[in-house]
Amino acid sequence: MSRYGLQKLYINGAYTDSTSGDTFDAVNPANGECIAQLQAANAQDVDKAVAAAKQGQPVWAAMTAMERSRILRRAVDILRDRNDELAAIETADTGKPLSETRSVDIVTGADVLEYYAGLIPALEGQQIPLRGSAFVYTRREPLGVVAGIGAWNYPLQIALWKSAPALAAGNAMIFKPSEVTSLTALKLAGIYTEAGLPAGVFNVLTGSGDQVGQMLTEHPGIAKVSFTGGIASGKKVMANAAGSTLKDVTMELGGKSPLIIFADADLDKAADIAMMANFYSSGQVCTNGTRVFVPQALQAAFEQKIVERVKRIHIGDPSDERTNFGPLVSFQHRDSVMRYIDSGKREGATLLIGGYSLTEGALAHGAYVAPTVFTHCRDDMQIVREEIFGPVMSILSYQSEEEVIRRANDTEYGLAAGVVTQDLNRAHRVIHQLQAGICWINTWGESAPEMPVGGYKHSGVGRENGISTLEHYTQIKSIQVELGSFNSVF
């Protein structure tokens, strides 16, 4: 018997057997252990979930703003009470260190839910005077039933980032977590029901993106799809959503973000920022600053500071409190990252440290790749052009501000960017020229609930978090009122 046993779908306020009875395994990437069996949804299950959502959504939307706010706030309290329990599940499912999941993943997800719970009463329309006898008023109304499709790197946090604004606006959601890391989304569904969310308002369907995800994006009963994942999958989701019923979409896709260090920067601070921008969550963060641009004159000194810091990383069992760097999410992904590392070696980048998977000792049975740093990289190298989604830093040298801005923008991606400098005039001047939706000055990675996040170019469509996201989960109804007489031309 696996640690977490058989996991069912969540439809209409209850854990429910899938129609097909098919299952797939959840595997702990730290040791290869099967920790759960998950049921796979099929077309009949999708129809059931949509029907339940259509029934529950009007009940939810009819509640007062304060009633909805209180229910979501209760869910926040439950999440915080069960923080350690959920963190342990997340660590077993993703391989992320417990020190990370316990302090970040559940905490920040709950923060976003609390933020939107507080915004519900602020969802207001406008009153627009036309003339003495006439005016227009607007209402922000929910879209109805929306779908969320999550990625594997922040399973619970992403489920909350998508469900919080959707539910706050009065919608129902059908959420499909990544088939690689599905466990905590199923726990979240039960928490929502326990908090008082009406049956059918939040459903979870587990299974593959090619099957369950595609069925959701094409289903005529769904009004919007919010997707987090890679560019190729995002384009497919967007095409299916538009080709079926002109669904609205939000896309949070990949990145190959530049981190620019200027000559006046504190090099120790710059090295610390570069480490967090590359090796947090074992490098599996879409906003990571994996293209690190350093002035040519400072390159050697910067490299030395990076190598010193990489040597201090504690790679180990994710359940060990001392560990701050765990395995990659799966053995398949480990092999993908290693192919990129091999490509960097072949194309002539200089390997400073790392560059191998751990195949001996206590961690040999896990999907571990050592933190890896390449230098003397070129813009045309595969490791510089493509998103690796792993612990691989590429250091590139530059000589002028104009040059580094041009090179930083020379990518199909536009998710994030950052600068490290003591000159705030330069910081703002450069940031305003970088083609990226999320930018940091003298820091990296923090995404507060109040901060809209999303990408330029191929890195996304729409935004998550912040007040503006509520606009993406509502539609405006305009009503004109005439208080005086009406004159017909007929």
Swiss-Prot record:
The modification Cysteine sulfenic acid (-SOH) is found at C286. It is an enzyme of class 1 (oxidoreductase). SUPFAM superfamilies: ALDH-like. GO terms for biological process: glycine betaine biosynthetic process from choline. CDD domains: ALDH_F9_TMBADH. NAD(+) binds at G150, A151, W152, K176, P177, S178, E179, G230, I231, A232, S233, G254, C286, E387. It catalyses: betaine aldehyde + NAD(+) + H2O = glycine betaine + NADH + 2 H(+). Binds 2 potassium ions per subunit. Signal peptide: none annotated. One of its GO terms (molecular function) is betaine-aldehyde dehydrogenase (NAD+) activity. Gene3D superfamilies: Aldehyde Dehydrogenase, Chain A, domain 1, Aldehyde Dehydrogenase, Chain A, domain 2. Its cofactor is K(+). The record marks D248 as: Seems to be a necessary countercharge to the potassium cations. The active site is at K162 (charge relay system), E252 (proton acceptor), C286 (nucleophile), E464 (charge relay system). InterPro entries: Ald_DH/histidinol_DH (IPR016161), Ald_DH_C (IPR016163), Ald_DH_CS_CYS (IPR016160), Ald_DH_CS_GLU (IPR029510), Ald_DH_N (IPR016162), Aldehyde_DH_dom (IPR015590), BADH (IPR011264). NCBIfam families: BADH (TIGR01804), PRK13252.1 (NF009725). Belongs to the aldehyde dehydrogenase family. This is Betaine aldehyde dehydrogenase. It comes from Yersinia pestis. The gene is betB.
